Every structure is written in structure tokens, then in C-alpha cells.
């Protein structure tokens, strides 16, 4: 939703913090055993929902991110925008006006209080729900969406505690409904090209990946009463770890077939001092301003290392505070070579275009000509026209709708969502325990060993 009152944030964040304290007291180091919970339903790996001639969509939250999804859905065929819900009238009016302007029927509106979304969920003419709300609402809304018989599509991150992750997994298995965390970066042109190259063996056997969310967002602290900064800022006062791991980690996980033949085993994490936000507040706000009364505890830079069961390593970084250029790293090293992003560059020992692997090949066009992903070949021009983070948003939503209308499994499932998001919690636990390792829960309950690998992904 566009806005959440501060008291609701503080209540939710306080509960999260209390849960973390308990977890940190009881957690051990690498010996920390995370036994799978009893299963209450069939695994949803490869879940295929009955084909939908038309995908009927409801939106919970149509503020900044949610409105972007509304815009993109208006460009898609085979969808009906049935209803929207938000607590902020201005963004409701904007969304309705845009939908009508696109010559689509006016959606039903639900508003009034924080629980108005339940009226939307009570309808029987909605197939999927797009959830774009502050983080603390993601888990309860996703669970209630599936309980209401609908498929849940949730903004990142999926959840804020290990228990929430398990509750969502359990609900998906019991209801046999999809719960996809909408990790849009997996649908970027470069990321999908690398996936294509990996599946064709260009880099050899995979050894190591590097992922990040490096995005200077101090300016969001000036969003006091509404917009993302009005609630996101407070997380820097409540947790110390990787607050936002999935943008970089999602693509690297799919390159490595995490939860489809390999899985995360354990993590170790450490944070730098937390200095930048307090300095920014002192510089940009009056001394008595609310932003100067907060105690910022989240380290400006968090670095985590993940070990997989097959022995691969992944470095994951988070930094939304320091003055530096944007990066997600997107580095993948194999036995035959390496791809690195920001800027994009490649070095391979065999199968390249004549350059030595001792120097970077930064001429990407010839690599696109040979390995551009089938999805981008098919709808890349539409994606570039419709935009959304360079087109990745459009490709993601197009692919979601395609799978639902054609009876195909989604590219990301609830186990991916839980595994990528839980880095938030586990990094916090490790930081608070002198960077000792913390074991990942196996949300698949062992099914990862026999799950079919993710293919090149096409349409």
C-alpha cells in the first residue's frame, strides 16, 4: 500500500525484533540444526494451475510499485483488472483513471482501513492477487490470498521471519496455490542471457557467484508522511543485516539451480559500522527533526557468504546508504570463464570470440547475437517500449500471464521466494553472533534433490 501509519510499522517491527532476539538466544553456530517441519500438503515444485482463458487480477497496494504493475498489466492481453485496494485515496484515483484511460472497465475499489483488502479477497471472480505493500504486510496478505483460493504474487521480500516463510510454504502446499515472489531482475535481458549461456555450458561447471543490491537511497529519508521512505527508513533502526537480498541473489540462484539439484546450506554475515544515515540526517534535517532522533543500527554495507550443499559459494552484499554507483554485481564464475555485470563483461577460456581470458571482452553485442534469451527475442521490443526497469517488469508479468494461460509451471515458486528472502533473517542472526554460520532451513523438505532443473525458460 502507498502508506502505512507509523504506529503499525512500529508494532510489526517490534514483533519481528522480538522474534529475532529469541532466535539469536537459542541459535547455535554451524551446528544450528534446522529440521524440516512436518508436511501438510503435497509439494508445489512444478505446480501447474488449471489453464485460465483470462487471468482476472486484483491489486493490493497501488502506490509507487503497485501502480507500476497496474500500468504494465494494462499492456497485457488476456487479463482483466477486476479490483484494487489501497489506504490512500490519491493513489486509488490515479490507478482508476489510468485503467479507464486504457479503455478497460473501471475496477472495483476497496479502501477505508488496513484490512479492507479482505473484502477484495472475499470475491470469487479474481484468480490472482498482486501484493505491493510495505514489507511487514507481505506474509499475512500472501497467506490470506491463498486461503481465499487465489494465487499470490508478492513484491520482494516474501517475509521477515523464518516462521513466516514456513507459514507461507505450508499454506501453498495445503491449498495447492502458487505463491510467487515477483523478483523482476530474473527477467532482465542480461540475466536471462547469462541463464541461457549457463544452460548451454559456456562457463563450464559453476563455482561461485556474486550478488548485490547497491543502490543509494538516503534520499528516501525525506519521504516522511507517505511513499516508500516513510516506512522503509525505520528498518534501518530495527535490523542489522542484509535487508534486501533478492534482486542480486535471485538470478544467481537460478543460474545454479538452487532448489532444483542444489540448495543453500549455510551462511555467514558481517556488517560495517552504521554511519551514513545518521550523517545524512544531520546534514539534511534540523537537529530536532524526527530523522535525527532515530538510532540507525543497520550497517551501511553488509556482506554475506553462502555455501551450497554442492560446495558452491555466493557473496551477497547490501548497501543503500553509501555514495556509489548502482550495482547488483551479477558475477558468475565457472571452470571455463566468468560473466560480470555493471558494466557487463565476459572472459572465457574456450568458445569465446578470440580474446584471451586474461582480459575482459566488453563488446556485448556479439554475445547477444549468439545467446540472447528466447523471451527477449520474442517480446524484447514490447518490453523496451513499455519499460519497467528497462523492460524486465514487463517481461516478468508477460511470462506470469503466459504460464497461467497455457498451463505451465511458473519460473519462480514459493521455495525460491522463501530461500532467497530468508537471507534477510539469517544474515541478522549471523551478524549478531560474531558472524558465525547459520544453517538454512530446507523449505523443500528434501524435494530439491529430485526436482527437475530450471531450463532456459521460454514461451
From Swiss-Prot:
Function statement: Glycosidase.
Q: Which domain of life is it from?
A: Bacteria
- Organism whose genome encodes this protein: Shewanella putrefaciens (strain CN-32 / ATCC BAA-453)
Concerning its family, UniProt says:
Belongs to the Gfo/Idh/MocA family. Glycosyl hydrolase 109 subfamily.
Q: Does this entry carry the keyword Cytoplasm?
A: no
Keyword NAD attributed: yes
What are the cysteine partners in each disulfide bond?
A: none
Cofactor(s) in the UniProt record: NAD(+)
Instruction: Give one GO term, molecular function aspect.
Output: hydrolase activity, acting on glycosyl bonds
| Modified how | Predicted to be exported by the Tat system. The position of the signal peptide cleavage has not been experimentally proven.
Keywords for this protein: Glycosidase, Hydrolase, NAD, Signal
Q: Which Pfam families match?
A: GFO_IDH_MocA (PF01408), Glyco_hydro_109_C (PF21252), TAT_signal (PF10518)
- Which top EC class is named for this enzyme in its record? hydrolase
Cofactor stoichiometry and binding? Answer: Binds 1 NAD(+) per subunit. The NAD(+) cannot dissociate.
Record protein name field:
Glycosyl hydrolase family 109 protein
Amino acid at each position: 500500500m502507498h502508506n502505512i501509519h507509523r504506529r503499525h510499522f512500529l508494532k510489526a517491527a517490534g514483533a519481528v525484533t522480538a522474534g529475532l532476539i529469541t532466535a539469536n538466544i537459542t541459535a547455535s553456530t554451524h551446528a544450528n540444526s534446522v529440521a524440516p517441519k512436518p508436511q501438510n500438503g503435497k509439494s508445489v515444485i512444478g505446480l501447474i494451475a488449471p489453464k485460465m482463458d483470462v487471468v482476472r487480477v486484483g491489486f493490493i497496494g497501488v502506490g509507487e510499485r503497485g501502480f507500476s504493475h497496474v500500468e504494465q498489466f494494462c499492456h497485457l492481453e488476456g487479463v482483466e483488472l477486476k479490483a484494487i485496494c489501497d489506504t490512500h485515496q490519491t493513489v486509488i484515483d490515479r490507478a482508476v483513471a489510468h485503467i479507464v484511460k486504457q479503455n478497460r472497465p473501471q475496477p472495483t475499489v476497496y479502501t477505508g482501513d488496513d484490512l479492507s483488502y479482505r473484502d477484495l479477497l472475499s470475491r470469487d471472480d479474481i484468480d490472482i492477487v498482486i501484493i505491493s505493500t510495505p514489507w511487514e504486510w507481505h506474509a499475512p496478505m500472501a497467506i490470506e490470498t491463498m486461503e481465499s483460493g487465489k494465487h499470490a504474487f508478492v513484491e520482494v521480500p516474501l517475509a521477515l521471519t523464518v516462521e513466516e516463510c514456513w507459514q507461507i510454504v505450508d499454506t501453498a502446499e495445503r491449498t495447492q496455490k502458487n505463491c510467487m515472489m515477483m523478483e523482476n531482475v530474473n527477467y532482465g535481458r542480461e540475466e536471462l542471457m547469462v541463464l541461457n549461456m549457463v544452460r548451454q555450458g559456456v562457463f563450464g561447471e559453476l563455482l561461485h557467484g556474486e550478488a548485490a543490491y547497491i543502490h543509494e537511497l538516503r534520499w528516501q529519508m525525506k519521504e516522511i508522511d507517505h511513499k516508500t521512505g516513510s516506512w522503509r527508513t525505520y528498518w534501518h533502526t530495527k535490523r542489522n543485516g542484509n535487508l534486501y537480498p533478492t534482486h542480486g541473489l535471485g538470478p544467481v540462484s537460478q543460474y545454479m539451480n538452487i532448489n532444483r539439484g542444489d540448495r543453500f546450506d549455510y551462511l555467514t554475515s558481517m556488517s560495517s559500522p552504521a554511519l551514513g544515515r545518521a550523517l545524512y540526517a544531520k546534514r539534511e534535517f534540523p537537529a530536532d527533526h524526527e530523522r535525527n532522533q532515530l538510532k540507525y543500527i543497520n550497517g551501511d554495507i553488509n556482506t554475506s557468504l553462502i555455501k551450497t550443499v554442492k560446495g558452491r559459494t555466493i557473496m551477497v552484499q547490501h548497501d543503500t546508504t553509501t555514495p556509489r554507483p548502482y550495482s547488483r554485481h551479477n558475477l558468475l564464475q565457472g571452470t571455463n570463464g566468468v560473466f560480470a555485470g555493471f558494466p557487463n563483461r565476459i572472459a572465457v577460456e574456450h568458445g569465446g570470440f578470440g580474446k584471451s581470458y586474461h582480459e575482459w571482452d566488453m563488446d556485448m553485442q556479439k554475445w547477444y547475437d549468439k545467446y540472447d534469451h528466447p523471451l527477449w527475442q520474442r517480446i524484447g521490443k514490447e518490453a523496451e517500449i513499455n519499460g519497467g526497469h528497462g523492460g524486465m517488469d514487463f517481461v516478468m508479468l508477460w511470462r506470469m500471464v503466459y504460464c497461467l494461460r497455457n498451463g505451465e509451471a511458473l519460473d519462480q515458486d514459493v521455495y525460491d521466494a522463501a530461500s532467497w528472502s530468508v537471507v534477510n533473517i539469517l544474515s541478522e542472526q549471523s551478524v549478531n553472533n560474531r558472524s558465525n554460520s547459520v544453517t538454512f532451513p530446507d523449505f523443500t523438505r528434501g524435494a530439491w534433490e529430485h526436482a527437475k532443473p530450471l531450463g532456459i525458460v521460454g514461451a
